[in-house]
Amino acid sequence: MNPLSRWFVTALVAGFFASSGLAQSPAVTIIDDAGKTISLTKKPARIVSLSPGATELLFAAGAGDRVVGTVIGADAPEDAKKIERLGDANALKYARLQALKPDVIVIWRDMTHELVLESLQKLRLPIYQVSLRNFDDMPRSIRRLGQLAGTESVAEVAAKKIEGRIAALPKRPAAKVAETTPELFFMMWDVPLYTVGSRHLMNDAILRCGARNIFDDIDFPAPIVEFEEIKKRNPDVILMGAPPITSRDWRERWSQFPAVTAVAARQLINFVDIRLTRMGPTAIDAVPALCEQLKPMRKGAPRR
């Protein structure tokens, strides 16, 4: 076969593969953060992310330009603000989501209500679940998202940088929390009373800052708790995650319960940083300021 004929045959074969779809990106099979195996016929070109934290992680993994839909609150990085909003995590525009024709839906497993998950499953679209218990889980999650999107090299660079940033944070206690460690209640909202459990990055941040979350025995990111249970657990510190005017109202309400150690010791402090509640890579940068706020706090501190 002469060179010209060989070139013609090669071009013809390549054209056949392209037209038949066999030249598409290879299939993807991956285990997500929840341990579920996800299989896609090709690397996803269109991703819907139903969590602000998951959206931030996708950008870190190099897949931000694939995200065609997300939820209210997905404001980081800056480019995420340009993505179409599909409502919030518990009030989604399902018809619009389906119209976007995503190759995969990325959710934050522990922050997605079971009814929402059931509704998503009815769409018969692949669902990838993100799940972080602490900061140390974050680099691994980014690497997995890189494998999902086919952006492994970008994800690896980002994961290594994040490992360095996490290493610079105060360390978690290696053993059981010391008796002198102040016990803290984080008041995320008042009606209903939302706090954080062991599956929230704020729980990890509190530990790294030298305190202990009084609800760290709840294996859930953001549980609703009863006021009587808070009084029973009697925190040394109450950390309020609300704007100044709202936290002032909360402080006034707490003043009616002087039997609570934190109230008697006047260890009620306000700390608002959306990065920690969003739970993406920027949450790492919020930890030093939290530690600074908690530094003066101590267990059973006397009234000042």
Outline where the language-model segments fall:
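Bacterial N-terminal signal peptides
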Residues: V9-S20
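A short, structured surface patch at a secondary-structure boundary
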Residues: A45-L100, V104-M111, I214, A242
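Boundary at the C-terminal end of the N-terminal hydrophobic targeting segment
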Residues: G21-A27
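Extracytoplasmic substrate-binding proteins
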Residues: A27-I30, K36-T37, D103-V104, W108, ...
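His/Asp/Glu-enriched short active-site or ligand-binding loop at hydrolase and phosphoryl-transfer sites
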Residues: S198-A222, A242, Q267-N270
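Bacterial N-terminal signal peptides that target proteins for export
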Residues: M1-A11
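Short helices/loops that flank or line small-molecule/ion binding pockets
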Residues: Y94-K101, L123, V225-N234
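Short helix-initiation/N-cap motifs at beta->coil->alpha
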Residues: I31-G35, L86-A95, M111, R133, ...
